[in-house]
Amino acid sequence: MTAGKKLDARALRADFPIFEQEINGKPLAYLDSANTSQKPRQVLDGMTQFYETSYSNVHRAVHTLAERATSGLEGAREKVRAFLNAPDVREVIFVRNATEALNLVAYAWGGNNLGPGDAVVVTELEHHSNFVPWQYIAQRQGAEFLMLEIDENGDPNLSQLDEIARDHTVKVVATNLVSNSLGTIHDLTPLVTWAHEQGAVFVCDAAQAAPHMKLDVQALGADFVAISGHKMCGPSGIGVLWGRGDLLQAMEPFLLGGHMINSVRVDKTTWGELPHKFEAGTSPIAEAFGLGLAIDYLEDIGLDAIEAHEHELAAYALGLLADVPGIKLYGPGAERRAGVVSFNLEGIHPHDVAQILDLSGVAIRAGHHCCQPLMQKLGVAATNRASFYLYTIPEEIDQLVDGLYAVRKVFA
């Protein structure tokens, strides 16, 4: 797709075999892409070919298949580096998912740099993957775990920062770029600047950002960034931690075993160089290759086109949903929202809503979305969440809205 060309979601749907089926006799309206994305043939077929022609273990042998597999893995690493605009490919660490990436930072950096008198700052909006590891490691290390409150749009209360800086030694600030629950797109510049003024590291959960918009880690200014392949048309089982090279060099390993060593003796083991120090055991080889294919696919379409398409869908959805009787919408307006819309129907449990929608072929998520502190803030146990991606078409949103009117009739 050429630069500036509008995304054609109808044409792109032909790349996704899953849309060839019906669910309960209805066209599949897959509105759960914030949970996980569907996979195009370019990724599925490419991974199959890799398994059939090039699969072997990597960095461990000199035979032809090993060389092919290693080339595939390291080629994918370079694609990730370019995708993130990271300065050095050695800063790209392959992990299972964003959750593991964030745990790696919490344990390997936090476990060696946090102590009594220090503080970790997060927000009420965080996915548990960027909340629970910091909560745990702070408690284990005797550090304080502090939380910025958010407003109804999901924006953190920056007026708390002066008091926090006055009363605490902040070592970590951790938050998301895009909320997985409200869809809020954040301007992180004030928080990044403040964190660095405190001498703290800034950890960014970009799992919901990387699939939907251009992500430049150097412009972002974060010290660590986590993404997940399965949310961006890639396979499950592959994620990425990007970190500043000087910080990664100074950190101890997270997992120990094969591949991550330099030498092993009875009295001492030394670690390998970056990125291998953090990639113990057999790598997710085909999964990394698949992530590289997914990046090719997204960049061919254009991240700007994907972002614009999702803004249009969000505006369309918010306009229709606002007219549904008894609905409560959460989060900001369409201009500051990624392709995520969370809502509740008055008097109807979200799980009941989701089950009835499934009868109409509509797939959404119902639950706390791994954001229980946010649910507590909103005063609810759960919400419904519809989420969009590059293959979403307006008719699927129509199908959702029609389904919600049907839900209202069932519970009338």
Feature locations, PLM:
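Pyridoxal 5′-phosphate
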Residues: 1-412
